[in-house]
Amino acid sequence: EMSASLVGSEMCIRDRDATAVFNMLSGYSEPLSWNELAVAPIWLRTKFTKLIRRETKHAKEGKPAKIIAKMNSLCDPGIIESLYEASAAGVKIQLIVSGICCLKVGIPGVSENIEVRSIVGNFLEHSRIFYFFNDGEEELYMGSADWMPRNLDRRVEILFPVLDDELKKRVRHILDVELADTLKAHVLHADGNYEKVDRRGKIALSSQDVFCREAMENVSKPSHGYQGRVFIPAEPVE
């Protein structure tokens, strides 16, 4: 239990949707709809496309619009095209992509509003987080899928909203810290090359060091499950 507090993936899924997923995987039933989840290979691509296009619509209406996405890989042509359209409309897009990224930044009139950074440190990060400004009604999602054809079209993947206010703050904190990383982050340029973040005038910050420190602080605090517990060794067998 204690190690699970230190090492784990962020997860928050409603029980009815979780049951429906396992029923689908087992062949017991095919859900006609979900309460909160979007599930690949049928519904997930449509969900992402709608979320991106909503930001595009808001930008065209002159409203503030923003997308932040963290993932391992980005190479889906359809998603990239939607991001280009959003950028051209004025949506500010910040992408944290640790691995493959086929999107090209810095194309005049197409991707000038897109920033891509990669953070590769001592630990392999596996979380996928998606933030949409939504005209001030901010929405946060987490899930298992990268923006790749195999994840959106050929695998069972899930996306779920982060609804609890405290969890939203925690997840947004993760994004903010990674966007502030000046030690391990590399920024993608228009020529396809990555370069270390320009640290001039900025605080030296490693996002993974911050998360490790916070994890150690959290695990050192007595949790509800451990309060009042005292280990009493058994008497030796005579």
Report the location of each language-model feature.
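Single conserved hydrophobic/aromatic residue that forms the stacking wall/gate
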Residues: 1-8, 13
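PLD/PLD-like phosphodiesterase catalytic module centered on the HKD motif
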Residues: 29-33, 41-238
